[in-house]
C-alpha cells in the first residue's frame, strides 16, 4: 500500500487528489489509530467514508493487501468506540424500517425519468412507472399450482424492491419465458451490504441469518439476484457473517451468471436496433469475477452493437453509501463516468446493478445527455417479448417504412 500505486485507480483520490482520500492515506490513518497516535474522530470516520468499496485498489496492489476489508473493519471499530455519525445513523434507521423505504419509492422514477429513447424502446423511467401499480402474482408463491415447472427464487434487494421494480418485472419475465416459476418471498430482508458500509457488522449478521433461514426453507433450483452488490454480499460476506451461528449460506447466482448457462442466442428471436455500451459494476466485475460472463450475455442480444467505453470498470461513485455521505464527491465521480459513456456515442448504457443505474442516470442528466440507462434483463425481455413490451423491433421498423 505504501508504494501508492493504488492511488492511480482510486476514484475518490482521482477526483479530489487528497492523500487522506487514497487507499494509502486511509490505511495510514487506520495504523495511527491502532498505534494510539490518533483518536477516533468525526474527521477520521469521514475519511473512511470516502471509500466507495470498489476494490480497484486491491487489483492494483502487488502485495495483495485486502484494503476494502481493512477499511470495513476500521469502520466497525470506530462505530463501537464513538458511535455512528448523524447521516450514518439516519441511513441505518431508514434501512431497518420497510415502511420508510417504501415511502421513498417515488425517488426512482424521478432519477430515471429523463431517459428518453433506448435500444429497447421507451425510457427507463417508463418501466418504473408501469410496474408501480402492477401485481404479477409472484410473491409468496408456493409453486404448487405449477408443480411441473422448475422453480427459481428471485432475491430483489432493497434498490430493486423499493425503487426499480421494472428490473424485477423484466427478470421475472425472462425467467418465466425460459420455463421457470419465479418466487419472491415477502419476508426477505436487506442483504446487509449498507450495514457493513456503515460499520454495523452485527446488523449485517442479523440480516444474513434472517435471509438465509428464509431461503433455506424454500426448495428451488436456484436463488438469483439482479443486484451486483447483493450477489457479492451473499457470496463473499455471508460465509464469515454466518460462521458463528453455523448456518450454511445459500448459494446465490447473479442473473448474468444464471443466463450465461440457460439463455441461448436462439431464444432471442426479435432483433433490436441500437448502439449500446456496458458499465461494469464494481461488485459484479471485481466483486464476483463476472465481467466476461456479463458481456457474453449482452453479446447474445440480436441487432445491437456493443461499443466499449474507456475504463468500463471505473467506479460510478455510488458504492459504500458515498452518494448519501459524500454527495459532491459522488457526483464528481459519476460525471466522469457519464463523460466516458457519452464519448461512445451509444444511445443506451447497460449495467447489472440498480445502484449504478440510478447513479449513472443522474450523472448523465447533469451532463445534459439523453442516454437511456437500463439493466441487461430489460433489453433481454425486449428481445424476447417485443410485442408485449411495446418494443419496436428492427423488423417492425422496416415494415412501418414500407407502409408509409
Can you describe what each PLM-predicted range is?
Residues 14, 34, 58-61, 195, ...:
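Short amphipathic alpha-helical interaction patches enriched in hydrophobic/aromatic residues
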Amino acid at each position: 500500500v505504501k508504494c501508492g500505486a493504488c492511488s492511480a485507480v482510486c476514484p475518490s483520490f482521482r477526483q479530489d487528489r487528497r492523500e487522506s482520500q487514497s487507499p494509502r492515506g486511509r490505511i495510514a490513518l487506520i495504523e495511527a489509530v491502532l498505534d494510539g497516535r490518533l483518536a477516533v474522530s468525526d474527521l477520521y470516520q469521514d475519511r473512511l467514508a470516502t471509500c466507495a468499496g470498489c476494490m480497484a485498489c486491491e487489483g492494483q496492489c502487488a502485495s495483495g493487501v485486502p484494503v476494502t476489508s481493512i477499511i470495513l473493519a476500521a469502520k466497525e471499530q470506530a462505530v463501537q468506540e464513538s458511535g455512528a455519525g448523524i447521516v450514518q445513523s439516519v441511513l441505518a434507521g431508514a434501512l431497518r424500517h420497510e415502511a420508510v423505504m417504501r415511502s421513498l419509492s417515488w425517488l426512482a422514477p424521478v432519477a430515471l425519468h429523463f431517459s428518453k429513447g433506448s435500444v429497447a424502446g421507451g425510457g427507463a423511467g417508463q418501466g418504473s412507472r408501469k410496474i408501480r401499480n402492477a401485481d404479477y402474482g409472484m410473491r409468496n408463491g408456493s409453486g404448487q399450482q405449477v408443480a411441473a415447472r422448475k422453480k427459481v427464487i428471485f432475491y430483489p434487494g432493497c434498490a430493486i424492491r423499493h425503487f426499480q421494480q421494472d428490473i424485477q418485472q423484466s427478470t421475472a419475465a425472462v425467467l418465466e419465458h425460459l420455463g421457470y416459476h419465479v418466487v419472491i418471498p415477502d419476508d426477505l430482508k436487506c442483504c446487509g451490504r449498507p450495514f457493513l458500509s456503515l460499520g454495523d457488522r452485527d446488523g449485517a449478521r442479523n440480516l444474513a441469518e434472517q435471509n438465509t433461514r428464509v431461503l433455506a426453507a424454500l426448495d428451488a433450483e436456484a436463488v438469483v439476484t439482479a443486484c451486483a452488490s447483493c450477489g457479492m454480499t451473499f457470496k463473499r460476506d455471508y460465509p464469515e457473517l454466518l460462521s458463528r451461528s453455523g448456518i450454511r449460506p445459500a448459494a446465490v447466482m447473479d442473473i448474468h451468471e444464471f443466463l450465461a448457462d440457460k439463455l441461448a442466442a436462439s431464444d432471442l428471436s426479435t432483433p433490436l436496433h441500437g448502439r449500446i455500451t456496458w458499465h461494469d459494476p464494481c461488485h459484479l466485475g471485481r466483486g464476483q469475477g463476472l465481467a466476461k460472463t456479463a458481456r457474453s450475455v449482452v453479446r447474445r442480444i440480436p441487432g445491437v452493437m456493443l461499443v466499449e467505453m474507456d475504463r468500463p470498470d471505473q467506479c460510478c461513485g455510488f458504492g459504500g453509501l458515498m452518494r448519501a455521505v459524500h454527495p459532491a464527491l459522488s457526483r464528481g465521480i459519476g460525471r466522469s463516468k457519464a463523460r466516458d459513456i457519452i464519448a461512445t456515442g451509444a444511445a443506451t448504457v447497460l449495467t447489472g446493478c440498480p445502484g449504478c443505474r440510478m447513479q449513472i442516470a443522474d450523472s448523465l442528466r447533469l451532463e445534459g445527455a439523453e442516454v437511456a440507462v437500463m439493466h441487461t434483463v430489460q433489453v433481454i425481455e425486449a428481445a424476447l417479448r417485443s410485442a408485449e413490451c411495446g418494443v419496436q423491433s428492427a423488423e417492425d421498423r422496416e415494415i412501418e417504412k414500407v407502409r408509409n
